[in-house]
From Swiss-Prot:
One of its GO terms (biological process) is cell wall organization. Pathway: Cell wall biogenesis; peptidoglycan biosynthesis. Meso-2,6-diaminopimelate binds at residues 389, 413-416, 464, 468. The modification N6-carboxylysine is found at residue 225. The gene is murE. It comes from Trichormus variabilis (strain ATCC 29413 / PCC 7937). This is UDP-N-acetylmuramoyl-L-alanyl-D-glutamate--2,6-diaminopimelate ligase. Its main location: cytoplasm. UDP-N-acetyl-alpha-D-muramoyl-L-alanyl-D-glutamate binds at residues 32, 158-159, 185, 191, 193.
Length: 496
């Protein structure tokens, strides 16, 4: 594609040299070290450094041109202005150029975007599962991986950056996908990564405290999430949780004809449930929808998973799936790695061990409440908080674990560059003096100790890492999987 054709999609680009206008662009790169001959380098401003400052490296590697911010030009003035183009809005420039270069793949798919603090991964997996059951080829992008039939790649971000995202959407189109289901993070929305993606369905699950290391406060966090439901993104229907305070605000802000609300118990919502019966292996009941009512049996436990189920049902109903087909598929849903995932080494195991990604106050509370009915003995919670992230949630999570678990093990969870002991102290500040938690900084030892101390009927909940198979210590990522350590401890326990 010619450079002038790409830049014609952007209204904030200046200084395009005529000599370069008809040059063929072979690829788009945002990493200067990855540039090769014929590439266009887009230097994106970051929170710590402006990537545009590295345009000389990109040009030296063969890039035909660099698009950077005026600030990057000012800090690193080009000696040859013919190769450096400035943009006053790098976010829009990057998204628009990437979409154009890859042939606007988002317009060739029916896209579903799911945003919210908790529930994105389970909801997107449910939507993908239902669409697949209807024999509709679907691409899934989210926290765990990007995948479609015949392809799977581990994810590095919940929502890819614009260039990678458009490339993956184009690959999905080429693979024959008709639908794309995407977790859309607040970071992605604030940074404009999904500009150029017209969503047929937008789902809002909930908003609770998280990412306040990035967003200035909860209102800023909400404003980022709400962008998904603006005309820039949403072209079809919004599916919104009416049981969430922020969801109620969104419902009021949008045109009623564009919204389906959902609620587990409120019959005034567009989608709701009745006749709920909670069992050790799941829930049964009736789902009420704008397309009719249907009985269901779900293997997922917990109130929050009922919300996830309603959201996914609403999304695929809007996309045209048959309600009875959906209900028939629900019992077959295999679950999601690291979400209420049971670790069992034999059928006669006398304790429950559950691994879950719960890493916010709300998700930890939901996990503990969901697990309680199925644990006849003591509930033992092993958890920590990530370093270089929102510090204000740490004492809140400590308080929740102290109140809802019978035994709390406070340990490390990706301390990154922070002092692990300081993180533990922040958590302990929220635990009342009347509760005596076990503090073990080494997560492997904490998991082993909790499982070896467990008595028949007890349940050990390993919270925070879920599907992750790594631990970040300083700037180093080492292999660490809660499930592996749990299996090792269970095997050791059997020999005692």
């Amino acid at each position: 594609m010619k450079l002038r054709e790409l830049l014609a999609t952007v209204d904030s680009v200046e200084n395009l040299p005529p000599v370069l206008a008809d040059t063929e662009v072979k690829g788009i790169k945002t990493n200067s070290h990855a540039c090769g001959a014929g590439d266009l380098f887009i230097g994106m401003p970051g929170t710590r450094v402006d990537g545009g400052e590295f345009w000389p490296s990109a040009i030296a590697s063969g890039a035909i041109a660099a698009i950077v911010s005026p600030q990057a030009v000012e800090k690193n003035p080009p000696s040859d202005e013919a190769v450096v183009i400035s943009s006053n809005n790098m976010t829009k420039a990057c998204a628009a150029i990437a979409a154009a270069f890859y042939g606007y793949p988002g317009q060739k798919l029916k896209l579903v975007g799911v945003t919210g603090t908790n529930g994105k991964t389970t909801t997107t997996h449910l939507i993908e599962f239902f669409l697949t059951k209807a024999q509709l080829s679907t691409a899934l992008m989210g926290t765990l991986y990007t995948r479609w039939p015949g392809f799977e790649q581990t994810a590095t971000h919940t929502t890819p950056f614009a260039v990678e995202l458009q490339q993956q959407l184009a690959q999905a189109v080429n693979a024959g996908c008709e639908f794309g289901v995407m977790e859309v993070s607040s970071h992605a929305l604030a940074q404009g990564r999904v500009l150029g993606c017209p969503f047929e369905v937008g789902v809002f699950s909930n908003l609770t405290q998280d990412h306040l290391d990035y967003h200035s406060d909860m209102e800023d966090y909400f404003a980022a999430k709400a962008l998904l439901f603006s005309p820039d993104y949403l072209k079809g229907r919004a599916i919104i949780n009416a049981d969430d305070t922020y969801g109620q605000r969104l419902i009021k802000a949008l045109s009623p004809e564009k919204v389906w609300s959902y609620s587990v118990n409120d019959s005034s919502a567009d989608l709701w449930m009745s006749d709920l019966s909670y069992e050790p292996n799941g829930v049964t009941g009736t789902i009420h929808t704008p397309e009719g009512d249907v009985s269901f049996r779900s293997p997922l436990v917990g109130q929050y998973n009922l919300e996830n189920l309603l959201a996914s049902v609403g999304a695929v109903l809007h996309l045209g799936l048959d309600l009875q087909l959906i209900a028939n598929a629900i019992p077959e849903f295999p679950g999601v790695p690291g979400r209420m995932e049971r670790v069992q080494i034999n059928p006669d195991q006398d304790i429950s061990v559950i691994v879950d990604y719960a890493h916010t106050p709300d998700s930890l509370e939901n996990l503990l409440k969901a697990a309680r009915p199925f644990i006849p003995g003591r509930m033992i919670c092993v958890f920590g908080c990530g370093g270089d992230r929102d510090r204000t949630k740490r004492p809140k999570m400590g308080k929740i674990a102290a109140e809802l678990a019978d035994l709390a093990f406070v340990t490390s969870d990706n301390p990154r560059t922070e002092d692990p002991e300081k993180i533990l102290d922040d958590i302990l500040a929220g635990i009342p003096d009347t509760v005596q938690p076990t503090v073990i900084g080494d997560r492997a030892i904490a998991i082993r100790t909790a499982i070896l101390q467990a008595q028949p009927g007890d349940g050990v909940l390993l919270a925070g890492k879920g599907h992750e198979d790594y631990q970040i210590l300083g700037t180093e990522k080492i292999h660490f999987d809660d499930r592996e350590h749990a299996r090792a401890a269970l095997t050791e326990r059997e020999k005692l």
